[in-house]
Amino acid sequence: MIKQIFGKLPRKPSKSSHNDSNPNGEGGVNSYYIPNSGISSISKPSSKSSASNSNGANGTVIAPSSTSSNRTNQVNGVYEALPSFRDVPTSEKPNLFIKKLSMCCVVFDFNDPSKNLREKEIKRQTLLELVDYIATVSTKLSDAAMQEIAKVAVVNLFRTFPSANHESKILETLDVDDEEPALEPAWPHLQVVYELLLRFVASPMTDAKLAKRYIDHSFVLKLLDLFDSEDQREREYLKTILHRIYGKFMVHRPFIRKAINNIFYRFIFETEKHNGIAELLEILGSIINGFALPLKEEHKLFLIRALIPLHRPKCASAYHQQLSYCIVQFVEKDFKLADTVIRGLLKYWPVTNSSKEVMFLGELEEVLEATQAAEFQRCMVPLFRQIARCLNSSHFQVAERALFLWNNDHIRNLITQNHKVIMPIVFPAMERNTRGHWNQAVQSLTLNVRKVMAETDQILFDECLAKFQEDEANETEVVAKREATWKLLEELAASKSVSNEAVLVPRFSSSVTLATGKTSGS
C-alpha cells in the first residue's frame, strides 16, 4: 500500500532525462556538434524523448515535417546564421561549408506559416549560399562534404506520403482528374535542397567513385519513392536529378531500371494510382534512346512486360505521350519489334473508352511509320479488322482518326502493297459509312479513301462491292425470314391459347416451312 502511494508521487527528474541521447544507445538519437556555429547540437530525437523535450529552454526550435512525424528535429540553443563565405579566408571555406550543411539538417514545420519565421529564413538563405558555393567550387569535394550533402537530402527530402494504398477502391467512383494537386507547403526549403542535390550530382568536382558510398541503392530507392508526390514542381526536380544520377553513376544503371520496372508492375497490377509515371517514362525515353544495338534481351522483356501493359490502366491518358515515345523508340531501334508492339496494342485496345481509342490510333500511326513491310504483313489481318471496327464507330473522332491513316504516305504504301488482303477486310466498313454514317465529315473522308481503293485495283474493288451487295441481300433475306418465323409462331400460339393446349413447334428447316395443318407431333 505504501509503495502504491509513493509510486503516485512525482519523482525528481534525473540528469539523464534532460539529455537527448541514451547512454545505452537505445532509442537512437543522432547528434551533430557544430563548433563555433551558435548551434550546440542538431538532434533527431526518438519518439520517447521528443515529448519530454517539446517544452525546452528558451531558443529551442521543434520543427516537425509537414508530412511525416518521423522527420521531427530539434535544436537546443539559438538558431543563428553562420558567417558568409565571402567573409572567411579560402582555407576555411570547406569547413564552413560542412558547418552550414549540418545547420541545414533541421526541418521546420511549414503547416503553421507564422511559426519560426526567422529561423526558416536563416535556413533558406544558408541553403542558397550552399548552392552558390557548390556551383563555383574549383576543388574536388571532400568525403566529409559529400556525406553531409547526402545527409541534408535525406533529412529534408525523404518522407512517406499519406495513404499508401491511395484508397484506390474509393477513388474509382470519383473523378480524380478534376482534383487540384496538393502543393508541398515546405517547398521554399525543398526547392533549394533539390537544387543543391542537383548541383552536387552534376558538378565536375563530385567524384562518382567516392559519392556512390552515399548515393547508394537505398538513396536511389527513396528518391524514386518521392516520384509519387502530388506536387509537379517536385517531380520535375526529381526527374532531372535521377537522370543525372543515371548518367554519372554507371554502377547504378541496372538497379535504377529494375527499380522503375517494379514501380510500373505495382502500378499496373495493384494500385493503378501513381503521380509520377509520366516523369519516369520521360527519363526512360532518354535511356532507351541511348541503348546500344543489338538490343539486349533484358530490354526487350522490359518492353513486353512493363511498357506495353502500361496501356491497360484507365488513367493512361495522363502519361500516354511519354509512353508512346518510349514504344516508338524501341521500334526504331529494332524494327522486328513492330509486330510485338502492334499485337500488344490490339490486346489492350479500349472497348468503351472512345477518347482512349483516339489516343491508341495516334500511337498506332507512329508505330506504323517505323514498321517495315515484313513485320507489317505478320499483323495486318488482326490490325485492319480492328481498324475496320474503328471506321464504323459512332464516335466521329474515332472514325476520323482511323481514316486519317490513309493520309500517311508510308502507311498508304504499306496498304497498297498488301491491298489484296486489306481491301476485303475494310471495304464493308467503308461502304456502310458512305451509306449511313451520321457525321458528314466522316462520310466525306470515307468517299476519299474509297476513291483511293478504287484507283489502286478497280477489279478487286468491283469484286468487293459485288460481295458486299450479295451479303447485304442475304442479310435482308435472313431478316425477312426471321420476322416471318416469329409472326407465324405468334399466330400459332394465339390459335391454341383458347383451349389452353400446349403448343408443339416442329423443327424448322432452312426454308422456314411451317405446318399450318396437322403437325407430326399431333
Curated annotation (Swiss-Prot):
Transmembrane segments: none annotated. Keywords: Brassinosteroid signaling pathway, Cytoplasm, Flowering, Nucleus, Plant defense, Stress response. InterPro entries: ARM-like (IPR011989), ARM-type_fold (IPR016024), PP2A_B56 (IPR002554). Residues 1-74 are annotated as: Disordered. Induction: By heat shock. Disruption phenotype: Wrinkled leaves, stunted growth, delayed flowering and formation of age-dependent yellowing lesions. Conditional phenotype with premature yellowing and constitutive reactive oxygen species (ROS) production in distinct peripheral areas of mature leaves when grown under moderate light intensity and low humidity. May partially evade the accumulation of H(2)O(2) via alternative oxidases (AOX) activity. Increased levels of AOX1A and AOX1D in leaf mitochondria. Increased level of ACO3 phosphorylation. One of its GO terms (cellular component) is cytosol. It comes from the Eukaryota. Gene3D superfamilies: Leucine-rich Repeat Variant. GO terms for biological process: brassinosteroid mediated signaling pathway; defense response; flower development; indole glucosinolate biosynthetic process; methionine metabolic process; negative regulation of defense response; negative regulation of leaf senescence; regulation of reactive oxygen species metabolic process. Residues 35-58 have a biased composition (Low complexity). Residues 63-74 have a biased composition (Polar residues). It is found in: Cytoplasm, Cytosol; Nucleus. GO terms for molecular function: poly(U) RNA binding; protein phosphatase regulator activity. Pfam families: B56. PP2A consists of a common heteromeric enzyme, composed of a catalytic subunit (subunits C), a constant regulatory subunit (subunit A), and a variety of regulatory subunits such as subunits B (the R2/B/PR55/B55, R3/B''/PR72/PR130/PR59 and R5/B'/B56 families). Interacts with BRI1. Interacts with IGMT1 and IGMT4. Interacts with ACO3 in the cytosol. Belongs to the phosphatase 2A regulatory subunit B56 family. The B regulatory subunit may modulate substrate selectivity and catalytic activity, and may also direct the localization of the catalytic enzyme to a particular subcellular compartment. Required for the formation of the PP2A holoenzyme that negatively regulates brassinosteroid signaling by dephosphorylating and inactivating BRI1 in the cytoplasm. Seems to be functionally connected with CPR5 and may mediate the negative regulation of defense reactions and senescence under low irradiances. May contribute to the epigenetic regulation of defense gene expression. This is Serine/threonine protein phosphatase 2A 59 kDa regulatory subunit B' gamma isoform. It comes from Arabidopsis thaliana (Mouse-ear cress). The gene is B'GAMMA.
